Amino acid sequence: MAISQPVIYTVSRLNNVVRLLLEQEMGLVWLTAEISNLVQHSSGHWYFTLKDQQAQIRAAMFKGQNRRVSFRPQNGQQILVQGQLSLYEARGDYQLIVEKMQPAGDGLLQMKLEALKARLMAEGLFDPRRKRALPTQPKQIGIITSPTGAAIHDMLTILARRDPALPVILYPSAVQGESAVPALLNALETAWRRNECDLLIIGRGGGSLEDLWCFNDELVVRAIANSPIPIVSAVGHETDVTLSDFAADLRAPTPSAAAELVSRDQQQQLHRLAQYQHRLQQAIQLRLQQHQIAWQQQYARLNTQNPRYQLQQKIQKQDELQFRLERVMTQTLVQANQQWMSQHQRLQQVSPKRQLPNLQKQHAYLYQRLLNAMQSKQQDSAQTLSRLSGQLHALSPLQVLARGYSVTTNAKGELIHSSQQVTTGEMLNVQLHQGTLKVRTEEVKSEN
C-alpha cells in the first residue's frame, strides 16, 4: 500500500494559501472597535490597529477607499468598519482591509438604514414601475419643510424667478428631532385631505445622518410611496441619500434643484408664445392662398363659358365663395384674437412690463396688415368681376342684334344659315333686337 507523500510548503506559499482561505471563507465583515496607532502614509494609505479590551487586529485602508470617509479618524475613537479579512504575506500578519469607515454612532444608524432599505426593496416599495410622471405644467405645488429653514427660502426664491405666476402652498413641518416624524406625516395627510396641489416637494437642507433620520423613518417612507399626489424628494445635499428619495416619484439632489425641476422657465414661455404667433401667421397665410387658388380656378371656368345663365351661376358661386372666405377669415381672426388675448393675459402675469407693449404693438401691426390684405383682396376681386361682366356683355348675341343683325329660325326652332335650308312658302321666325317677325318665303335664291 502506497504511502501518500506529505505536502511541503514554502513560507510564502503557506501565507498565500492562508490569505486565500481567509478572503474566500470570511468575505466582508462588519467590525466595531477603537482605532489606535493610526498612520496616514504619504502615499495616501492609512494603517492602524483595531482593538477592544481583550484583543486587537491590524488594519489598512487604501487611498481609493479612505477618500470617501466623511470624517478624520483619531486615535481612541470608536468606529464601525466594513472590510475583507486578509493576510499580509510578507510578514504573515493577519489583517483587515477596510472598505468603509464611520463613527460608531452613525455606523449603527447606517446598518439600521441598510437593513430597512433591503426589506422595503424586497417588498417592491422602491420599484420604478410604481413611480409616476410629474405634471409638466402644475397648477399649484405644495412644499413640506420647515418654514424657517434655508431650504424654503432657496426654493421660493427660485420659483419666484422662474415662474412667478405658479402658486405655492407651504405645509410647515419639523424636519429634525423626535417631533419630525409625526409632523411630516401630519403635513402629508393635510396635503392629501385638502387636495389643492397636483405636486408636492418634501425635503430640507443638508445635515448628518442623524439629522436626516426622519426621512429614513419607515412610516414616512411608506407614506411617501403611497401618496395619491406625486412627490419630489429633496433632502440634504447631492451626496445625501435617504429612503425617501427611493420612495418618491422623483429625487432631486437639493431643494434648489427640486424648485428648478418643477417650475417652468419664464423665458421658455415667452419663446413658446412667439412660436404660437408665428404658426398662427402661417396658418392665416396658407388659408388665404388656398382660397385665392380656389377663386382663380372658378375664374378660369367662368372665362371659358359664355352664356348669361352660366355666368349668373358662376357669379352666385363666386359670391358664395367670397362669403365663405369672409366667414372663415372672420372666424380665423376671432380665434386668433381670442388666442392672443388668452396668451396676453397669461403674459401679463409672468412677463416684464417692458416686453408687453412691444407684443401689443406687434399684434396691432399684424392685425392691421391682415385687415388691409383682406380689404385689398376683396376690392381686387370686385374689380375683376366687373371687368369680366363687361367683356361678356360686349360679346353677348343680344349686342349683335342691337347693331341691326337678326336671327332667323324655322318652325322647329332651327337656325337658318343658308337659303338651301328654306323652301318657297315656308314660314320663318325673324328675331330682331326688339321684337320678332313671322314671315312667309316668296322666293328662294341660291348664291353660287
From Swiss-Prot:
Its main location: cytoplasm. It holds the Pfam family Exonuc_VII_L. Its EC number is 3.1.11.6. GO terms for biological process: DNA catabolic process. GO terms for cellular component: cytoplasm; exodeoxyribonuclease VII complex. It is an enzyme of class 3 (hydrolase). InterPro entries: Exonuc_VII_L, Exonuc_VII_lsu_C, OB-fold_nuc-bd_dom. It is found in: Cytoplasm. It catalyses: Exonucleolytic cleavage in either 5'- to 3'- or 3'- to 5'-direction to yield nucleoside 5'-phosphates. Disulfide bonds: none annotated. One of its GO terms (molecular function) is exodeoxyribonuclease VII activity. Keywords: Cytoplasm, Exonuclease, Hydrolase, Nuclease. Heterooligomer composed of large and small subunits. Bidirectionally degrades single-stranded DNA into large acid-insoluble oligonucleotides, which are then degraded further into small acid-soluble oligonucleotides. Belongs to the XseA family. This is Exodeoxyribonuclease 7 large subunit. It comes from Tolumonas auensis (strain DSM 9187 / NBRC 110442 / TA 4).
